[in-house]
Swiss-Prot record:
This is Large ribosomal subunit protein bL12. It comes from the Bacteria. Homodimer. Part of the ribosomal stalk of the 50S ribosomal subunit. Forms a multimeric L10(L12)X complex, where L10 forms an elongated spine to which 2 to 4 L12 dimers bind in a sequential fashion. Binds GTP-bound translation factors. One of its GO terms (molecular function) is mRNA binding. Forms part of the ribosomal stalk which helps the ribosome interact with GTP-bound translation factors. Is thus essential for accurate translation. GO terms for biological process: translation. It holds the Pfam family Ribosomal_L12. Belongs to the bacterial ribosomal protein bL12 family. It comes from Prochlorococcus marinus (strain MIT 9515). Keywords: Ribonucleoprotein, Ribosomal protein. InterPro entries: Ribosomal_bL12, Ribosomal_bL12_C, Ribosomal_bL12_C/ClpS-like, Ribosomal_bL12_oligo, Ribosomal_bL12_oligo_N_sf. PANTHER family: 39S RIBOSOMAL PROTEIN L12, LARGE RIBOSOMAL SUBUNIT PROTEIN BL12M.
């Protein structure tokens, strides 16, 4: 890491949550990007709470857990492949997760990501719930 990037990193570490939120907004405007798309839940939660006013965040959940409830025995390998791709687990760990259903596949992910993963697992032959 260069001295310049280290200095910037140290400056960022000293920011309060409010200052960090303002910085993110300024970066989004300056570069025409959205932090919510790349950072997922971490950046989406403060934005949702600020945009809805008081009580808005409590009405709609922003983080979801994807839970594999069961799977069709004939589709075990397909479900296993989807779980491995989604979690980055090794073959043995993914197999243990799938075989111990009901089991949480991913925790605290954005609604869109959770729904996408649910659809992929269901298409492979698994039964999934979002909590």
């Amino acid at each position: 890491m260069t001295a310049k990037t280290e200095e910037i990193l140290e400056s960022l570490k000293s920011l309060s949550l409010l200052e960090a939120s303002e910085l993110v907004k300024q970066i989004e405007e300056a570069f025409g990007v959205s932090a919510a798309a790349s950072a997922g839940v971490v950046m989406a939660a403060p934005g949702a709470a600020g945009g809805d006013g008081d009580g808005g965040a409590a009405e709609e959940k922003t983080e979801f857990d994807v839970i594999l409830e069961s799977f069709d025995a004939a589709a075990k390998i397909k479900v296993l492949k989807v779980v491995r791709n989604a979690t980055g687990l090794g073959l043995g760990d993914a197999k243990a997760l799938v075989e111990s259903a009901p089991k949480t596949v991913k925790e605290g992910i954005a609604k869109a990501d959770a729904e996408t993963l649910k659809k992929e697992i269901e298409e492979a032959g698994g039964k999934v719930t979002l909590k």
